[in-house]
Amino acid sequence: MTTNTQEINFQQQELKGRDFLTLADYTKDEINYLIDLADYLKKQHKDGVIFEPLKGKTLGMIFEKSSTRTRVSFETGIYQLGGLGIFLSSKDIQIGRGETIADTAKVLSGYLDGIMIRTFAQEDVEELAKHASIPVINGLTDLYHPCQVLADLQTIKEVKGKLHGVKLVYIGDGNNMTHSLMLGAAKTGMHMVAVTPDGYTPNKEVLTKAKSIANQHGAIIEWTSDIATAVQEADVIYTDVWASMGQEEEQQQREKDFENYQVNESLLEKAKTDVIFMHCLPAHRGEEVTAGVIDGKQSVVFQQAENRLHAQKALMTALMAD
């Protein structure tokens, strides 16, 4: 291992002390900086370089929703950056139940250097950030999943060489992934089409916001239920589970409603020949995507999953490093 860092040759942004609650809060330049920093840290890691800008720093990780990728990538990431991650489950801390969110935020601010929270209500994350004096990172809510999309944008840029003008077609439920993808695509000048069945459309307020942002950045954000037309000329096809955590009772109805929205080999053939397939994982093989697609040569899902580590290392470095 070496401690020699490589020269940073991209435009830096000052983000120290900021919260990361939604991509709508960040400019195009700031998002591109985080992607460039993620690429830089990924290369450092692959080259065996020790880089510890968070030595002596501690991140509290609050999980009211369980996760594989979010916990492992954040905990591994802060360790690689020289810091410490403390896992707090719903048994250890109950946001808004018993002790108020405001009191929790103030107490944790006295112990920690940053908070990552994965929970249900976006309002709880915003309340935590309002009263915390340290950076708060949204690890997922029912409304947004910005950390995942930061890694997604990094992955698309790695494979396609750019973001501006890239056509991304999201197929499935109009959920937190859809919302954050729309905001990320709007900020970076992409053309995104969200394809959902009637009754599963994205949040109207978020869709309106994304379209407004898109107008400022030369992006296009659309919604349709016509899957065949949407995937034409697609550079990226993206999907997610049909029933998210907490929606298990709706599983049978959702399987019926989404049966014509599966990503399979014949669907990929309708897109560009060099289309890539993405999924935030975990995947339910045989439901929203076939095994042939997720394991096929056009799939980048495991590269995408790995980039959660590098994108979040970039985020923690930018927000928490001295």
Curated annotation (Swiss-Prot):
EC identifiers of the protein: 2.1.3.3
Catalysed reactions, semicolon-separated: carbamoyl phosphate + L-ornithine = L-citrulline + phosphate + H(+)
Localization annotation: Cytoplasm
UniProt keyword list: Amino-acid biosynthesis, Arginine biosynthesis, Cytoplasm, Transferase
GO cellular component term of the entry, any: cytoplasm
Binding positions (L-ornithine): N176, D240, S244, M245
Pathway(s) the chain acts in: Amino-acid biosynthesis; L-arginine biosynthesis; L-arginine from L-ornithine and carbamoyl phosphate: step 1/3
Molecular function terms, GO-annotated: amino acid binding; ornithine carbamoyltransferase activity
GO biological process: arginine biosynthetic process via ornithine; citrulline biosynthetic process; L-arginine biosynthetic process
Gene3D superfamilies: Aspartate/ornithine carbamoyltransferase (3.40.50.1370)
Binding-site residues, carbamoyl phosphate: S67, T68, R69, T70, Q94, R118, H145, P146, C147, Q148, C280, L281, R308
PANTHER family per record: ORNITHINE CARBAMOYLTRANSFERASE, MITOCHONDRIAL (PTHR45753), ORNITHINE TRANSCARBAMYLASE, MITOCHONDRIAL (PTHR45753:SF3)
Family matches, as HAMAP family: OTCase (MF_01109)
Family: Belongs to the aspartate/ornithine carbamoyltransferase superfamily. OTCase family.
Function comment: Reversibly catalyzes the transfer of the carbamoyl group from carbamoyl phosphate (CP) to the N(epsilon) atom of ornithine (ORN) to produce L-citrulline.
Protein name as it appears in the record: Ornithine carbamoyltransferase
Native organism: Oceanobacillus iheyensis (strain DSM 14371 / CIP 107618 / JCM 11309 / KCTC 3954 / HTE831)
Taxon lineage: Bacteria, Bacillati, Bacillota, Bacilli, Bacillales
